[in-house]
Structures are given as C-alpha cells and as structure tokens.
Amino acid sequence: NYVTGDASHWDRFSNWAETMPKLIGNPLYHWNQLELARYFNVFDLLGPSSAEKIYSHCNELLGKEGLSSRKLIKQSNVKVICTADDPCDTLDHHEKINKDSSIECKVIPAWRPDRAMMPEKGKDFISWVESLSEASGVKINGFDDFINALEKRHQFFHEKGCRLSDHGIETFYAENYKEKEIHSIFQKAISGTYLDEKEILKFKSHMLYIFGVMDAEKNWVQQFHYGALRNNSKRLFEKLGPDIGCDSIGDWSVAEPMSKLFSRLDNEGKLAKTIIYPINPRDNELVGAMIGNFQDGSVAGKMQFGSGWWFNDQMDGMIRQIETLSQLGLLSRFVGMLTDSRSFLSFTRHEYFRRI
C-alpha cells in the first residue's frame, strides 16, 4: 500500500521514517541521511519523532524554485547524464534538452537492446519487432531485415551522441551455431512457433556477438550487467508485474562463455572497450582475472571491472571490488563509480563511494 498503492504522501513518508531506525547497517540508511543533509540541510536523524518536522521542512524547500530537478543536477556538479534507451525510443526528449541552452548538463542516450535478444517472450517479442520496424522504417520479413533495422537505429543513436551500450543479461552467451540456424530461429520466433532452449541460447549468442561488432565499429563502450535472477515470486509478478523488488542474485556458470565471446571478438579485431558488472560477488576474482586476458594496448584500461552493482552497491561490496581490482589489475586505470538510480537525489552515492 505504501509503495504501489494509494496511500497519501504523508503516510508513505511517516512509515518510511518509522523504518529508518531499523536500517542500521543497510546502505539505505546512509543514502537517506546523505540526501537529507546535502539537499535539504537536514542533519537530524530521520525517525518517528523527527518525521513531521523533516517532512514540513523538505516540502517547503521543494516548493521553492531553487530546489528543482535542474538545480539538484547543477548543485551535484553533474556534467553528463546517460539514459538507458530501447532501440525503438525516439530520443525526442534528448533533442529538446540539448537544444535548451539553459540546461548546462549534457544528456545523452545509451543503447539498451535487451528486448532484441528475447525471442522466448513470444507475443511480446513479435510486438517489439513490429515497433522496431516502425522506428527504423525497415519492413522486417527475415533476420537480415532485423539486423538492418537494428543497425539503422544504432546509427541513429550514434548521431544523437550515444557512445555507450548496456546489456542486462542473465549470463554470457556463446553457443556454437551456424548463421543459417539463426535465420530459421528468427522466422520461428516472429511466427509464434515454439523455440526450445538450445535455439534460444543460440539466438542470444549471435545477437550478443552482433551487438559487440556494432559497438566496436563505432568505437563505443559496451557494458554488461549480468547475473540477476529475476521475478522470483510468481505471486507478486502476476499481481504487480516485473521490477517490483523480487529480483536477486543468480549463480550461472559464466567464465567459459564470457571468455569465448570476448576471444571471438578480440580475434576478429572487434572487441570494443568493455565494462563488466557482476551481481554475484563470487565472480569478483573471475572478472578481475578475465579482463587481463584481453587488454590489447589500444587504450589504457580497455577492459574494466565495473564498480559494485546492485546488491554490491554498499560499503563492503565497494571495498571488495576495489581490493580485487587492485590485487588482480590496476586500480589506477579504473573508470570509477556510476549511479544507476532513477532519483535526482541519488548523486550522493558518488560521495558515499568517494568516502570509501
């Protein structure tokens, strides 16, 4: 009721305030207090006794023009924001923002083509292919058309300033296949024909490779966020849908397919600059060691072990990532922290990282 329901703003806030003292040891406690301190000048600890006073103070500030979203971005010294965008997105808002001279921060898209790799989704995949056809202006009758449409959108994103891709995958895919098989699998997918697990994995393997080639040819950076086990509660998924807090850490075997994919791209001279974010901390040493195999001297730190992500985005997780990278690679070549939160107050997470 207090998250997705129709509870009032005050009821939501007061219940959160009641929860805060119970969060000692959880990063939410630090994040919340940092946000209150940096943006609202509140240094009291949020709890049941302070909730009403803090609520009134924050609402008063939010009602003033000085604490707008733009002000928060400027105050946080943000120079560039990358959004995660589906290949079918129009990017109209990016164009409007970048034409507005009053906005000092640059906002650029990032390519997030996850839905292009999900033939197992049946009707949803078919619907997405239709949307891709409309967005690209390419009539998609077969796999070659599908790739042509994606390449057109990739070029469109490039023209809009995109230099970064992001792939949310369960694991790395590197099955053996023949390209004619992929054409057949695609035809089955868009006709609504059942695909077995091997066909699905072969399709994902080829698409991950194709996207790697596209990124390398445009000198983009490719990112891989992998390992999440999603929608674990069937009950809540059927009631509320995806992305409602029922995702957790998976334990796929990843070393061999990761190596195989990178080796194929590297051997063809098509391995782009890469950042890898494992969700399972057991993979820290795996990733830290793996990236050393594919550094090629073209750019310092071409292969990156990304900062602690999701369940590792907290003090111990950050320390583990930093220590592993220091021991197995070069911390001096690390590209640093990122904030993948959807909140305009989340820039305090960079302070949290810097303190560590």
Each model region followed by its residue ranges:
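Metal-cofactor-binding active-site regions of metalloenzymes
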Residues: 1-218, 270-272, 276-288, 292-356
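Catalytic core of soluble alpha/beta enzymes
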Residues: 173-187, 206, 224-286
